[in-house]
Amino acid sequence: MILLRASEVRQLLHNKFVVILGDSVHRAVYKDLVLLLQKDRLLTPGQLRARGELNFEQDELVDGGQRGHMHNGLNYREVREFRSDHHLVRFYFLTRVYSDYLQTILKELQSGEHAPDLVIMNSCLWDISRYGPNSWRSYLENLENLFQCLGQVLPESCLLVWNTAMPVGEEVTGGFLPPKLRRQKATFLKNEVVKANFHSATEARKHNFDVLDLHFHFRHARENLHWDGVHWNGRVHRCLSQLLLAHVADAWGVELPHRHPVGEWIKKKKPGPRVEGPPQANRNHPALPLSPPLPSPTYRPLLGFPPQRLPLLPLLSPQPPPPILHHQGMPRFPQGPPDACFSSDHTFQSDQFYCHSDVPSSAHAGFFVEDNFMVGPQLPMPFFPTPRYQRPAPVVHRGFGRYRPRGPYTPWGQRPRPSKRRAPANPEPRPQ
């Protein structure tokens, strides 16, 4: 997996409006993206535990949270927003996948000054555990209503990525479960999440929306769960952000930097103690490759953003350096020194992060995730193609057929794939 730096993430999301909807796990997804837009650092345990705070890394609490009454009820609200000169990221806390509140959010987005370019969404745990004996039937009906509504409200240029719910632990004590329900619900919640993911992913693909199977990617990473069995540590959330960004880059036809994967993120290991802590893209834009990598994170960014007085500029791509010839019988090794991109409460080098797989995802050329996970330092490894007979089905699903590259190491460099979402017969006029 290519690990993007903060400067590259700022370039990828330049002049983009990103909306994230979901529960407390997706609040951490929002926080990690906001942090990554500014710094090459990981979220601290304190930042992951905090909820409803007035400010986080230059963002603002717009509604709910500590501005109101903090509780774990079904009507809890929290709206956060991060805004810079060239980025807008907004988070809405959801306790149900489709509701009157969700319809209000969609109307707000539809009537806003800017239409969203990217929507990242999931809702599962609250839906299947907090709404009584008919929770399952309601969840299935709400999923169908949700994707029908999204197909009518979101513009065709907007990329919606439905994330499957992350795995949960053997024991679940998260705050979304009232104490009297924890013992009853925790015994079967783990399997119910798998079942819910199947139905939600099927419904999303049925309406031609993208699906990113986070449950698959992190199914062997439970040693990185918080003690409550629901939330995850900062390293997992950074890996999650990289998966999302790679998926988005592929859908938008953006070519990621050509450099060796940096460190092995996740690999199989014996169970250990839990870590404590709390392509529907815009079809009119050609594929633009990101700039080549920098030799050190202390150098200037890939693309200097224009000052506020100048108009916004699109992504630019300098001429790549001349290729280096390799002998046909030798594997290709990374060029240049390894990067040290991150700093946090834990000091480590970037070669601690590497995501390797025998299962290349068809949606991402040269993008891999190993099916056995762990966090730990590993030595750099050469690239060897995987025989075709060892390649099972991809785990990043699209709602429609995709162009497949000839091999797992072929860069995309293609135009964004056209959307098969049909525009509504009688679309409602956008409010002025």
UniProtKB/Swiss-Prot annotation:
Residues 264-293, 398-432 are annotated as: Disordered. InterPro entries: SGNH_hydro_sf. Gene3D superfamilies: SGNH hydrolase. It comes from the Eukaryota. Belongs to the PC-esterase family. PANTHER family: PC-ESTERASE DOMAIN-CONTAINING PROTEIN 1B, SARCOMA ANTIGEN NY-SAR-23. This is PC-esterase domain-containing protein 1B. It comes from Homo sapiens. The gene is PCED1B.
